[in-house]
Amino acid sequence: MIRVNSLQVDSRLLPLSLQANAGEVWHVIGPNGCGKSTLLAALAGMIPFSGSVQVGGLNVSQASLSELARHRAYLAQNDKPSFQLHVFQYLALSVPANVALERSEVASEIDQISRLLNIDDKLHRSIHQLSGGEWQRVRLAGSCLQVSPVLNPSARLLIWDEPAAPLDIAQESLLYRLIERMAGQGLTVIMANHDLNRTLRHADQVLLLSRGVLYRAGSAKEVLTQEVLQSVFGTSIRRVELEGHPHLLFD
């Protein structure tokens, strides 16, 4: 379980609290500059904050980086590193140290996640030979290996900052299959997202931020209403039903 009590980051993010259960998928949404990345970085223990964040039994503000790495994975928006690595080397570095499994079991988990993201044919390529979408899928695979319950029983939380941003439509579908897999294994997934229709379909819980303030929180159905979204995003939005499912239309 993830417990957040009165989390605040100076004037960028005003106090908010939440409780997320194992296996839940949370989407953090809102206009650019509303505090999404700040919230995720604080949850990950990467920036100072006031209040408290508990990941399982771990107090995030008091934990070392190595302790944090055992309990959560955090994927920020980032460029490729300047050093040279092949994809399989990058993924191997993502596997937690001192894994109490046979090498074949570790290789099997790497293979399954690589196949799920359609990067299994790129394992022997340099990361600098990858397109933006390919590199993002490698990064997603690495973060999943870090907190895979098969490899790391201590892991509780997967934090992604706009993971779909560099992905095309087909690759985004792979991403949501991966999210379903990781949540199905008991991890809590908290991610920033701009595709509100994906949030409507896939999020168990939604945090809507506006100017550093938690404007709404609840299920996707409760938060993603026409009135609420129009007031925050300042644009015309319609919610319609198509084949029995809700969809958002934007001007």
UniProtKB/Swiss-Prot annotation:
A GO term, aspect molecular function: ATP hydrolysis activity
Gene3D superfamilies, per database record: P-loop containing nucleotide triphosphate hydrolases (3.40.50.300)
UniProt superkingdom: Bacteria
Location in the cell: Cell inner membrane
Main localization category: membrane
Keyword line: ATP-binding, Cell inner membrane, Cell membrane, Membrane, Nucleotide-binding, Translocase, Transport
Gene Ontology cellular-component terms listed: plasma membrane
Keyword Transferase among record annotations: no
Record: residues binding ATP: G30, P31, N32, G33, C34, G35, K36, S37
Topology of the protein relative to the lipid bilayer: Peripheral membrane protein
Domain spans labelled ABC transporter: 2-236
Catalytic activity: an R-cob(III)alamin(out) + ATP + H2O = an R-cob(III)alamin(in) + ADP + phosphate + H(+)
Enzyme Commission number(s) of this protein: 7.6.2.8
Database matches in PROSITE patterns: ABC_TRANSPORTER_2
Family, as annotated: Belongs to the ABC transporter superfamily. Vitamin B12 importer (TC 3.A.1.13.1) family.
Subunit organization: The complex is composed of two ATP-binding proteins (BtuD), two transmembrane proteins (BtuC) and a solute-binding protein (BtuF).
Functional summary from the UniProt entry: Part of the ABC transporter complex BtuCDF involved in vitamin B12 import. Responsible for energy coupling to the transport system.
Name of the protein in question: Vitamin B12 import ATP-binding protein BtuD
Organism: Vibrio cholerae serotype O1 (strain ATCC 39541 / Classical Ogawa 395 / O395)
Lineage: Bacteria, Pseudomonadati, Pseudomonadota, Gammaproteobacteria, Vibrionales
